[in-house]
């Protein structure tokens, strides 16, 4: 399972980089995005399962949150159906559980003698908890009005995919150094790919928000395959 996890992770990083910088909605973006989705779902699920076996609660939270973000990001640009609405409802409950659990573990880490819990400092737990709870509020908005306008759905797709890629990128570049090639270990450049994901995410979110005000409603329809 570890080999599958590693291979899926590397595939996700490469496909995610292509999808992140490709023109959104274009053929390259769609194809690399689908590869990214499947690779991330495999990587996050195998990572969570291995973490359950090894009783690593922090990685379980990261794996479940990543799986949730990718799945709901994919559904955000699909044609709304009752089946997808049910999946979103279950995912919303999972995100709420992850968020509350992460915040609780963060408080436990604050009170611990070492200042960490399972080797993870409080800010990491609080970050996961905050993201999960914010995503839950977004799910509630979708649940209340399933046919939310396309601009909202596109931004929902963007930030969730990008944050899932952020988690994967941070895990690879800022995690245990033995994962990296020798020339990158100890390099001060390691945080750069992680920060770039956030920079590009905010760029695309800003671009969508600015264009949303002046484009016709047809522009906001779900992204569809054209070839």
Name every feature range the model reports, one short phrase each.
Residues 1-227:
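Alpha-helical membrane insertion/targeting regions
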């Amino acid at each position: 399972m570890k080999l599958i996890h590693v291979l899926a992770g590397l595939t996700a990083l490469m496909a995610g980089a292509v999808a992140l910088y490709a023109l959104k909605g274009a053929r390259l973006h769609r194809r690399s995005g689908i590869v990214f989705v499947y690779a991330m779902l495999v990587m996050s699920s195998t990572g969570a399962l291995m973490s359950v076996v090894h009783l690593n609660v922090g990685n379980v939270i990261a794996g479940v949150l990543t799986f949730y973000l990718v799945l709901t990001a994919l559904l955000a640009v699909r044609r709304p159906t009752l089946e997808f609405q049910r999946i979103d409802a279950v995912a919303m409950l999972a995100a709420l559980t992850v968020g509350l659990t992460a915040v609780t573990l963060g408080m436990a880490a604050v009170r611990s003698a070492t200042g960490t819990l399972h080797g993870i400092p409080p800010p990491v737990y609080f970050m996961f908890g905050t993201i999960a709870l914010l995503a839950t509020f977004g799910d509630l908005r979708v649940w209340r009005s399933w046919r939310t306008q396309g601009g909202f759905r596109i931004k929902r797709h963007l930030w969730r995919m990008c944050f899932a890629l952020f988690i994967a990128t941070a895990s690879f570049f800022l995690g245990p150094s033995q994962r990296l090639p020798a020339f990158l270990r100890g390099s001060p450049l390691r945080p750069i790919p992680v920060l770039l994901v956030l920079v590009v995410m905010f760029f695309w979110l800003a671009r969508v928000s600015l264009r949303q005000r002046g484009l016709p409603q047809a522009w906001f329809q779900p992204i569809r395959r054209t070839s």
